[in-house]
UniProtKB/Swiss-Prot annotation:
GO terms for cellular component: manchette; nucleus; perinuclear region of cytoplasm. This is Serine/threonine-protein kinase 33. The gene is STK33. It comes from the Eukaryota. It comes from Homo sapiens (Human). The active site is at D238 (proton acceptor). ATP binds at L122, G123, K124, G125, S126, F127, G128, I129, V130, K145. Keywords: ATP-binding, Cytoplasm, Cytoskeleton, Differentiation, Kinase, Nucleotide-binding, Phosphoprotein, Serine/threonine-protein kinase, Spermatogenesis, Transferase. It is found in: Cytoplasm; Cytoplasm, Cytoskeleton; Cytoplasm, Perinuclear region.
Amino acid sequence: MADSGLDKKSTKCPDCSSASQKDVLCVCSSKTRVPPVLVVEMSQTSSIGSAESLISLERKKEKNINRDITSRKDLPSRTSNVERKASQQQWGRGNFTEGKVPHIRIENGAAIEEIYTFGRILGKGSFGIVIEATDKETETKWAIKKVNKEKAGSSAVKLLEREVNILKSVKHEHIIHLEQVFETPKKMYLVMELCEDGELKEILDRKGHFSENETRWIIQSLASAIAYLHNNDIVHRDLKLENIMVKSSLIDDNNEINLNIKVTDFGLAVKKQSRSEAMLQATCGTPIYMAPEVISAHDYSQQCDIWSIGVVMYMLLRGEPPFLASSEEKLFELIRKGELHFENAVWNSISDCAKSVLKQLMKVDPAHRITAKELLDNQWLTGNKLSSVRPTNVLEMMKEWKNNPESVEENTTEEKNKPSTEEKLKSYQPWGNVPDANYTSDEEEEKQSTAYEKQFPATSKDNFDMCSSSFTSSKLLPAEIKGEMEKTPVTPSQGTATKYPAKSGALSRTKKKL
């Protein structure tokens, strides 16, 4: 094309009669094997929406100058790499830290064949196909998902666009990486990292089931990915074994397999527009993985993903789903009940801690399920019993009590067995016989305490007892007991009780009855 055409709104090529628009790079299809490139869009990971940018006019002029001084025989080889230079040199994998994913619009799919060599088919869908492809220049292998937009229809195309936007916005070691996107009027090509070991479900089918250690590694990676998504207000909504790909695997010294997994298929994923938009309504997902609140058509939150993690974990350990039925209606009934069973012999080798995690993941009430962040901190994953963060508010304490009543009972038993300060005081005998000049009998003290309570009622008997015991002198106490009393924090109830000054000298000697 003539250089003067760059300064006009549009012009026609004398060889192919194709029109080019201002600020849009076009390559003559009659002179090269590459269809015209229309628009290059750039997307930032800091935003779900994609920011579009056109190739600058200065760069086009520079390319035209280079093209003019180049011989005719060299023209095809240079122009055939226009997309490659734009995507790989400026926005390639090496520059991924800048958070840019190129979205290149082209006339047809021939341009992609100039960049990639297509290989085996990795998977098929109702209106799409996934093919292994090798970059001709770098020899890097990728998985290209090709979707026929015409067959998919408008609703499916919207889901595809949402999936693309979400993949452009995320970056996590256990979430599939989107390298770039090519789009024609009829098709869309997603170039993603290749997971050569295939789906996690295929590996499970071959093994039968995983050991507890093997499952722990997988769940830790999965929980990390889901915690990242939830922290960014993204709900996957279709977690299942088929949507967990295996990038690579490693056999350790114990002959156990360690899998590097990637969460994929964000077709049903949704990003909440704000923190206040906590609940979702649409019923979606795969039945055996669906949470009770989803199948009941109730409002639900990101906790539906937690239930799905529980189903995945159960299947990894057992080799089959936690709920099986002859019909979908009966299946949903079992899911609503949420009763887990561990009668099979395979569970004999599984620790109680792992079973406890399953129960916490698959609580019927989503409010009582642990979160992805709490799962990451669970001692079953960390191996550290002290790693779990203690609850900081009443709701969290109530949830912990519901999830781990045994541990709460153990803590309560320990506290009961631990001698209290009052018991130490009772057993303590001071050196020698030190007479108390103001000594009064127990009956007299009881009468005085009752009279005081009537005159100055406290909020509870416990508060009154705390108030009374707080007046006990520590002058004659041994250092151990004295230090313990000084370290004891003053609770709000104690503060309330001490508002009322003692009007009787005998009150200062009142003891808490044991």
